[in-house]
């Protein structure tokens, strides 16, 4: 089910004339980058996964084809509750290829938040890890299906353990053919719904168009003089704006590398920084503080 968006006509005209907004979608930018640098590493994570732009594009195309086969249409919401894994980017790209709206969720959310958010955004498909932090997130949602009015499928992201009670992401990718042609989406259409953390009430969904995200991340890269040679480290949750926009989206807009970390510790962060020769990192103040403290404690 698509969402009708209303724009301030004068502001939209100004943004388009200024070059902030255009007709292109995030998917258009992804395809351009994947064609330009197919063999370049697009994303890695701390579990050793590494995908080139070409390989990631192929896997996302297979998942996109499956989404369409399950009745997903442009504007439908697809939710995924994943930590900093390469699979997060893969699912996001599959949504871009089909015109589905990405709804990334925080891994820390439990039953109450999940039921609220999934019903609020009317998500049709939900992805969650089979195992993460000694929990089984995908099994958490299965008993709640009768409370989720719009949900049709639950997919287990079987990165750390096999999927025993749900569809498995790896099997979907293995058994699906690549999508023959991505669905064309206009820049003014809805791209993602990011939910607030809900510290003062239930989480609230913030609707972002392709143009919203593109204007933000092009400005971010330009202001920091980031290029295709940069390597972005993202220790923040990908369900937050910082992780979703700066850690996953911005890198592929410019053909850079995204380095993801699922559980932040200063030691793990410093290890990835050195291993991947990262040049850029974004995070909240506590992340930076802990990182600097760890550096100070290292032997000279």
Task: Give residue spans per PLM region.
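Conserved AMP-binding/adenylate-forming core of the ANL superfamily
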Residues: 22-23, 31, 39-85, 89-93, ...
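Conserved pre-ATP/AMP-binding loop-to-beta segment of ANL
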Residues: 38-39, 156-161, 174-195, 202, ...
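Conserved AMP-binding A3 loop
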Residues: 50-54, 191-215
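A short helix-loop-beta submotif of the ANL/AMP-binding
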Residues: 65, 77, 83-103, 107-111, ...
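Conserved helix-loop-beta element of the AMP-binding
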Residues: 122-125, 144-155, 232-233, 279-283, ...
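Conserved AMP-binding/adenylation subdomain of ANL enzymes
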Residues: 214-231, 239-280, 286-298
């Amino acid at each position: 089910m698509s969402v009708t968006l209303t724009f301030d006509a004068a502001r939209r005209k100004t943004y388009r004339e200024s070059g902030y907004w255009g007709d292109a979608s995030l998917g258009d930018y992804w395809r351009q980058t994947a064609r330009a640098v197919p063999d370049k590493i697009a994303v890695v994570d701390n579990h050793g996964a590494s995908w080139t732009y070409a390989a990631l594009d192929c896997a996302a195309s297979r998942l996109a084809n499956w989404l369409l086969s399950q009745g997903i249409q442009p504007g439908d919401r697809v939710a995924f509750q994943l930590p900093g894994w390469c699979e997060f980017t893969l699912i996001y790209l599959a949504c871009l290829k089909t015109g589905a709206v990405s709804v990334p969720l925080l891994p820390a959310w439990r039953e109450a938040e999940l039921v609220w958010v999934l019903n609020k955004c009317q998500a049709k498909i939900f992805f969650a890890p089979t195992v993460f932090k000694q929990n089984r997130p995908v099994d958490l949602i299965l008993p709640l299906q009768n409370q989720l009015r719009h949900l049709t499928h639950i997919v287990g992201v079987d990165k750390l353990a096999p999927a025993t009670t749900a569809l498995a992401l790896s099997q979907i990718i293995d058994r699906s053919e690549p999508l023959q042609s991505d669905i064309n989406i206009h820049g003014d259409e809805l791209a993602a719904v990011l939910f607030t953390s809900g510290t003062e009430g239930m989480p609230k969904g913030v609707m972002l168009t392709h143009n919203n995200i593109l204007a933000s991340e092009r400005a971010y890269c330009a202001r920091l003089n980031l290029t295709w040679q940069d390597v972005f480290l993202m220790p923040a949750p990908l369900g937050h704006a910082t992780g979703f926009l700066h850690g996953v989206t911005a890198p592929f807009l410019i053909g850079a590398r995204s380095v993801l970390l699922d559980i932040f510790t200063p030691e793990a962060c410093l290890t990835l920084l050195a291993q991947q020769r990262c040049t850029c990192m974004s995070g909240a103040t506590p992340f930076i503080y802990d990182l600097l403290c760890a550096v100070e404690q290292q032997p000279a």
